[in-house]
């Protein structure tokens, strides 16, 4: 299998039990997760040598986060230790007409102070096949931006395929929007595989087309073949992949996705999901697609693998997707009815 490197923040997640509100909570359930950490876990479970890069504090909470990753076969040997704290986010799980709610407490977390010299990037990217990062990491701080850029450049020096999930988070875009768009747009020259669509590109990269409002306009335009291909060609991606989510309620979603390449546009299977936990669903989708590409499935089968992996993730509490390749393949071959396997 392939050697995959991911870079990002792993956070402590605290959630009231079940569907309780924050105001009701007297205790919290603990999970660990983060966009790139979630991808690292899934790819390790699919059999790849999965290396996670981050900076994590030298305390019991940091140790617990690393222990969680190691227990799922993620290579943590290149994680830098130090800094003040692990980022925290509080998640209130929604239900029916009440949406989920997230409160972040991540200021001055260790990853925001990480520097390129703390990582032996030449050794890390030696013999690597894929590097994955998201648009979350470089906008966390100036230091995180410099680390991300250094990793992107080093990956390309070693001829490593680069995957980038635009992953827009509004709470990280409250200031210097044009500066952040310019910074991420410049990073796209290193990117081969991009997860996003025209709306994500407009928000994160400042992408525009004459006469079209991708941010506030009709969403279907942002994911149709014409405009997906325009984004693909503008940034010279090999693949542009998007999810297609129809939120019927906080508990029930329609789920699908599409992939665009220079010579193909393919919309995948439609799923109807009853949601246990949707956090990490997009990361499971990305990791499933990447596994498909690494396993030479081709873009269409890779998309279906990603959709099925993410569909299963929506049934699992926590950020991480505890599944195997065989379970995903069984889902693809089934009608998704969830019958008991004996």
Where does each model-flagged region fall?
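Conserved N-terminal subdomain of the carbohydrate kinase-like
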Residues: 49-136, 328-342
């Amino acid at each position: 299998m392939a050697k995959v490197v991911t870079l990002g923040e792993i956070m402590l997640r605290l959630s009231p039990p079940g569907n309780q509100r924050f105001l009701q909570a007297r205790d919290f359930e603990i999970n660990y997760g983060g966009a790139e950490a979630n991808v690292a876990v899934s790819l390790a479970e699919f059999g790849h040598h999965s290396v996670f890069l981050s900076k994590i504090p030298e305390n019991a909470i940091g140790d617990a986060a690393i222990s969680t990753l190691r227990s799922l076969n993620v290579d943590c040997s290149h994680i830098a230790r130090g800094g003040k704290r692990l980022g925290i986010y509080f998640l209130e799980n929604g239900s029916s007409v009440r949406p989920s709610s997230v409160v972040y407490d991540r200021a001055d977390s260790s990853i925001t102070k990480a520097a390129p010299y703390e990582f032996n990037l030449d050794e890390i990217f030696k013999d690597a096949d894929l590097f994955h990062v998201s648009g979350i990491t470089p906008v966390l701080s100036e230091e995180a931006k410099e680390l991300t850029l250094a990793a992107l450049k080093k990956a390309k020096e070693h001829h490593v395929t680069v995957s980038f999930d635009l992953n827009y988070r509004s709470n990280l875009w409250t200031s210097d929007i044009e500066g952040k768009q310019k910074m991420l747009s410049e990073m796209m020259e290193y990117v081969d595989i991009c997860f996003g669509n025209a709306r994500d590109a407009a928000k994160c990269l400042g992408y525009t087309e004459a006469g079209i409002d991708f941010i506030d306009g009709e969403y279907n335009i942002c994911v149709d073949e014409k405009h997906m291909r325009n984004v693909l060609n503008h940034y010279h991606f090999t693949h542009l992949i998007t999810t297609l989510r129809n939120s019927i309620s906080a508990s029930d979603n329609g789920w699908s996705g599409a992939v665009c390449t220079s010579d193909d546009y393919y919309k995948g299977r439609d799923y109807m999901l009853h949601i246990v936990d949707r956090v990490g669903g997009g990361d499971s989708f990305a990791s499933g697609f990447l596994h498909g590409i690494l396993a030479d499935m081709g873009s269409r089968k890779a998309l279906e693998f990603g959709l099925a992996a993410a569909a299963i993730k929506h049934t699992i509490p926590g950020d991480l997707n505890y599944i195997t390749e065989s379970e995903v393949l069984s889902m693809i071959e089934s009608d998704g009815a969830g019958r008991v396997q004996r």
